[in-house]
UniProtKB/Swiss-Prot annotation:
SUPFAM superfamilies tied to this protein: Acetyl-CoA synthetase-like
Entry protein name: D-alanine--D-alanyl carrier protein ligase
Source organism phylogeny: Bacteria, Bacillati, Bacillota, Bacilli, Lactobacillales
EC number(s) per entry: 6.2.1.54
UniProt subcellular location: Cytoplasm
Alphabetized CDD domains for the sequence: DltA (cd05945)
Catalytic activity field: holo-[D-alanyl-carrier protein] + D-alanine + ATP = D-alanyl-[D-alanyl-carrier protein] + AMP + diphosphate
Binding annotation for D-alanine: D203, V307, K503
Single GO MF annotation: D-alanine [D-alanyl carrier protein] ligase activity
Amino acid sequence: MSNKPIADMIETIEHFAQTQPSYPVYNVLGQEHTYGDLKADSDSLAAVIDQLGLPEKSPVVVFGGQEYEMLATFVALTKSGHAYIPIDSHSALERVSAILEVAEPSLIIAISAFPLEQVSTPMINLAQVQEAFAQGNNYEITHPVKGDDNYYIIFTSGTTGKPKGVQISHDNLLSFTNWMITDKEFATPSRPQMLAQPPYSFDLSVMYWAPTLALGGTLFTLPSVITQDFKQLFAAIFSLPIAIWTSTPSFADMAMLSEYFNSEKMPGITHFYFDGEELTVKTAQKLRERFPNARIINAYGPTEATVALSAVAVTDEMLATLKRLPIGYTKADSPTFIIDEEGNKLPNGEQGEIIVSGPAVSKGYMKNPEKTAEAFFEFEGLPAYHTGDVGTMTDEGLLLYGGRMDFQIKFNGYRIELEDVSQNLNKSRFIESAVAVPRYNKDHKVQNLLAYVILKDGVREQFERDIDITKAIKEDLTDIMMSYMMPSKFLYRDSLPLTPNGKIDIKGLINEVNKR
């Protein structure tokens, strides 16, 4: 039986609270909370929020990790007509204060201890939230978030300048959710049993909670204290009865460090959903060997177009024949185009910027008309967004990814994709992980390419000097990389800096190299 689209997220959650009140919606390492609990707790908290007399539709910050109270608070806020701004409890203090400065929330709900002391915004802490749950207040839903109202606001991790708050409406969310639960590429089962690992402040989290709540399934969450400790992580993962794994490819790479991460130990896993960064052929091949019968979905899209706009099930033929995986068939309600530098549509097969339009495109950045005007526009009568990604559309309707426009450089007359260089470096038998970074001269021209490299275990001991390692890597890659793409300098590190979302912070490294 195929899944039906939903008309309203809260009505759908209410429906499951009536039809399957004792079915688990949230499982934190074995501690279960049911759909009945979620309704009762969110109703009771929504009643308390209404009594506070906050300005209508004003946004509320919710600070915490993967606790059940986070989800119940989100639902309570949606019922009471407020957008929520999730901030992960592991966020840097500067980031937290920068978000508060931009958002000016009417309330902070701190499920984890709030790290800033001097805050003028009213605050509710975990004990008060639990007290509100215990009151068991009834609640009549009269003014929920609906239509073009903001459902959530997620701040992207800008490495420089102030963070940008992407406003996602209820309509935007429905466009994404209904595509995901009805699309044949995802093939999402009803009552999905879903891993809930990415933090709520990262919009990849919407890829697990939205379809799960829309289809009456269960979220299995891993607190971040566990995901950051290999031993605990592996012990916990094997105990979770999950069928769908949703994460960045990097998190799957981390899981594959354990030889036990395979279909024999985890026979329940039937689907892998990837988004948030590029899924490489190497990672997908390794995963296919470990889970030969699982469906591996490569999805793509910016936060500004609600999580993802395209997806494809990776085939064995793709793994055998392609150097780079396609990023998917685009969703029907979101016309996606490739345009040239003048803004003209390009025919299939030609490379340009990926433009997405339609009902999933955000209304823009919160209180930032300048940045909104730069990125958002109207295209053929529909709201549209400049992704800043380079792509090509095939005649079959498959989108191919060509890297970030801001990670494209001109060097000695050649146009070079930094991501291409990084991918090729990662093919060396000596390299665990590597990224390429340009160094600019005073005329803003690329002077040379540098490689930041993490070596595989045991490699350093095989060589006397770094220069010998570099020579061996270059020889190793002679047949793979064009000479003009080969970095002139290799810097060896034990780790590479990550953004708050767990991606390698390439912009930060570029700034470091160029002392910006």
